């Protein structure tokens, strides 16, 4: 887990308030998405065109499916097992992909599969990040239609006002109001539980749904639509991946405790309470969540629902920022401008390009679907796809890293794979029913990420073709030494055994070398953080030439000047006013050489041209940087 989480948990033995604080924080950040699912899940099941009757057997069968889905997928798979697959405390599909890639290192094809699976999972997460705010806020605002007649036409405008306002404040950060997220969500889950108890008391027979026989009987009595219903019941599981993605903020134990002590009981009670309402009045299936509430509680629940959905949306947006930073560090996404919105919380970041892209996607979804019922058809494909990818990557971890015995690992993996495959298959028909949007968004993002990754590989390969081995270069400098000037020159290069092109261009045009020449390589590790004693490697070649390798984790800011200040060597001088950084800026020219399709080469050239340069990314001083350009055919 993260350092902060580790410290807090380490002292929680004597301070129960610390453990409670972490649990409340986890409720506010991790459980917003799954916590707002009761707003639309049962409504979609009964009015979504699946043909499920709102009668005794239908209600108990659906409730049983939801209950056991929560037990198996969330409780057993994610909370008990997946949360243990942390990458030095960090979670999420990117962190899991990096962990599985290390575990699969001896197997080239398996490693390639892990990389592709990780990219697909990340792409689907971005698609999910657009749908969650749209469907959550829409479903909350729709409660006004129950309270007041004639407000149907105001649902979309009100939802857009809330959502656009949420995206507009991202640049200013949410640290100040973030402290309220946990208490508000605790209040939300308390309200869910209270409403559920209110409904169950009126129809206690709904508690029979905890018997899995009702789920089995439902499939038997609905052979034509049984699997299709899973496409609707999976809405109750949306947000399960967020538990894993946000693990680095709180640690495994607070997230697990919050689930079993508060979130799971509240969700089960509320779903069962909604089922009781439908049993009492089949017409309540049109919006069982709000019709479960007594008349006096309707408007307060609309207000609380709106707050809860905004918090859930905020968590998803922050998750997209965090995932993007990880992807940038791992080399899957072009470098973007990352702003820190809090001086106290390192995880509070803002990425403008991601924020505006998400906002456009969310607005288009709201305008295109206009209601949570319509949007529910688009939900599920991205969610179940990400869940399936997580299971596949977990299979690699179980086999290669945890080294479970075959008699245990194979059956467990097969059961996880079968359940997730069933949910995914149930959602595939949604692609032609409105679910194409997250799929198309995922495909576009996958193409961008894979093109960037492959393009960077080709760029390095092309630069290597004309590179000069470092020992040969140093030997030639001894034979014909150029004029040396005072100071330190740092040349950034991806290769550790060749001369940077910027160094050759500088020597060719300026005919001089600095007293100290440092060839600097930055290595992004598959782990979230790097220990201080592993931050740098230094090798002296003599005649003022040095090789320095800096290591950064995918959750760290690659601050080169800051890291070099820790590099204490008597013979190296990194004084700011005596150090000059030389960078190479490549201009890519698409060609007919073997590598990528011409359109992908053109796309990569566009991405490279618009990506943030090394200067900002590595926090280099503006007045101490010289950029030298070069053209490269790929």
Curated annotation (Swiss-Prot):
Give the organism the record lists.
Pseudomonas paraeruginosa (strain DSM 24068 / PA7) (Pseudomonas aeruginosa (strain PA7))
The record's principal subcellular location, in a coarse class, is membrane
Membrane topology of the entry: Multi-pass membrane protein
What does the UniProt function comment say about this protein? Transport of potassium into the cell. Likely operates as a K(+):H(+) symporter.
Protein known as: Probable potassium transport system protein Kup
Originating gene:
kup
The organism's lineage? Bacteria, Pseudomonadati, Pseudomonadota, Gammaproteobacteria, Pseudomonadales
- Record HAMAP family: Kup (MF_01522)
Membership in a protein family: Belongs to the HAK/KUP transporter (TC 2.A.72) family.
Any one GO MF annotation of this record: symporter activity
Cellular-component GO terms for this entry: plasma membrane
Q: List residues traversing the bilayer.
A: 19-39, 62-82, 113-133, 150-170, 177-197, 225-245, 259-279, 291-311, 349-369, 379-399, 406-426, 431-451
Keyword annotations for this protein, in alphabetical order, are: Cell inner membrane, Cell membrane, Ion transport, Membrane, Potassium, Potassium transport, Symport, Transmembrane, Transmembrane helix, Transport
| Catalyzed reaction equations | K(+)(in) + H(+)(in) = K(+)(out) + H(+)(out)
- Give its localization: Cell inner membrane
